[in-house]
Amino acid sequence: MIKPKNILFAWFWLTCTLTHAQLTMPRATSTYWRDSVPEAMRQSYISYGAQYIGQPWATIPDSIFGEFRRNGNRTHYEQLCFQKRTQLAAVAMAEIIEGKGRFIPDLKAGLDNLLAEPWWGIPAHYGPAQPKQKDQTVDLFNAETAGLVAWIRYMLNEALGHDMQ
C-alpha cells in the first residue's frame, strides 16, 4: 500500500538524485527540436506560426477593458487578449522548431506589444477601484502571461538578443 510518507520520500529522493541537466528543458538552440520532434508535427507548428508573419498585434482599448464594469461584457476583451497570446505562442513555437530567425521580428513586436499592456489580467478579475493593500492575490491570467513571457525568454534568449532583456 502506498502511503503519503512513501510518496514524499520518493519525491525527495528523485529531486535529490536528478541532475540539473535532467530537469532542464532544451532551449531553442538545442538539436532536440529538430531531431526528436516528428517532421509532421514540426511542419504543423511552423505553418501555424507562419500565418502570423507580418500580421498586426492587437491593441486592447481601455473602452473594451471597461465594458465589464459598464455592462458585464467580458468576451470582447477576452477575445483580443487570448488571440494576442495565441499569436505570440504560435510565433515563438514556430521559431523554436524552425530555428532560422524568420519569426524573430514578429516575436519581438509581439513581446513589445504585450509588455506595453497596463495589466495582464481579465477585467472580471480586476477587483475594486482601490485594491486593499492586504489583498495580495495573484491573478491567474497575470501569472499565465508572465509564464509565457518567461518561457519565451528562456527558450529564445540568444535569438532575441540584448535589446529584449
For each feature predicted by the language model, list its residue ranges.
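Short, N-terminal intrinsically disordered low-complexity segments that are rich in Pro/Gly
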Residues: D35-P38, Y77-C81
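Aromatic-lined, polymer-binding surfaces characteristic
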Residues: E78-Q165
